[in-house]
């Protein structure tokens, strides 16, 4: 059962200084005046009286913890990325944050983005109408976190820093605390943990560890803590789905790494990366092609970015077997590989063991900062540009793409629209919607050409190079035989049709 408890001001339907209660089949909401809640714990109410009594005995979030959650207000002037010399209208938006050790406030980078004279940030404590000026001390868009400083003894009086916990197990009950856009009331929403996985941080297009929770959340909750027991397990930063029922949380390992990096370095980048792309090696045919023994585990390198510390050391089609002596699983469990790398720091050296043409090699490689291929420009900073002869030259940034609604022009490509499950394609199920660029090293012109290349294969292995440098290898004769069986299984008359 989900519930949402809001504390801090009297409902507009209540004329007396009394709690007002709204109950529906799924959600129970309590709105209490601040005077009634100070020094008390938050309770929720259900139609079921027994359930209500049970909840009263074990309230979700202590009032002292709520005292440490603040509302964040940002006023900014945004620059146009298409015409970068122009400013757009002034914008005001907000979110949530909470106190951490060292008299600092932790929030999302997108809540206070920008570190220039055109950004003004203020914070307000729970139950207070006083806004205090805040300064962005540290910001990292790759993990969507920022640290604020407030130079006011009055603000910090009686406020305790919240403590961080560990990554929660699945189905753990959690509470989202923050200030949704619906009003100035602090709200507590109950939910459960539904997943822990590497995911996209949409604002920066980077991939780091995330926690997914089933809880109704809103934009103003961004930057607020997600709590279990008396510990913070993460910071809410994204919402998935039209019904706003799935919240995405930055977990404590990412938060701790950011805070430690902020204390140790003046640079914003704190997460390490090999700056390369890989794929799993579950399929027996591709394992045989790259001379992997049955007991060997590893992942195949598809592409190495020129900015990578592994550039000119590792090679495309190398198989990463281990990092610092820790085996890499063929299943490409991104939490164990990507998260392991990201928890190291830029310029830190790691020992990488690879399999190259059937032989093992080890190399020391320096990590680079986590950085997407397209530069993540702070949306409210003055963009870089150069004008000559009426041409405006700008770097391609994510904010430019967002402003311009940039789209690649349509071209005729051959893509894998579906993967029909069979032993022959085991391990390739996630290659759906990828473009086929080459067949056995020959660039694909169109669908007819792809058919000719496949049916004209004379080698033992059929190799398909896909977009994003993904590779697919099939035993040609086995694949031909499996094709007939798959067609018969799905009652498909022919493997080929043309307009």
From Swiss-Prot:
InterPro entries: DEGP_PDZ, DEGP_PDZ_sf, PDZ, PDZ_sf, Peptidase_S1_PA, Peptidase_S1_PA_chymotrypsin, Peptidase_S1C. It is an enzyme of class 3 (hydrolase). It comes from the Eukaryota. Residues 1-24 form a transit peptide. Its EC number is 3.4.21.-. GO terms for cellular component: mitochondrial matrix. Keywords: Hydrolase, Mitochondrion, Protease, Serine protease, Transit peptide. The active site is at residues 110, 144, 222. Coiled coil: none annotated. Residues 94-259 are annotated as: Serine protease. GO terms for biological process: proteolysis. GO terms for molecular function: serine-type endopeptidase activity. Residues 272-356 form the PDZ domain. SUPFAM superfamilies: PDZ domain-like (SSF50156), Trypsin-like serine proteases (SSF50494). It is found in: Mitochondrion matrix. Putative serine protease. PANTHER family: PROTEASE DO-LIKE 11, MITOCHONDRIAL-RELATED, PTHR45980. Belongs to the peptidase S1C family. This is Putative protease Do-like 12, mitochondrial. It comes from Arabidopsis thaliana. The gene is DEGP12.
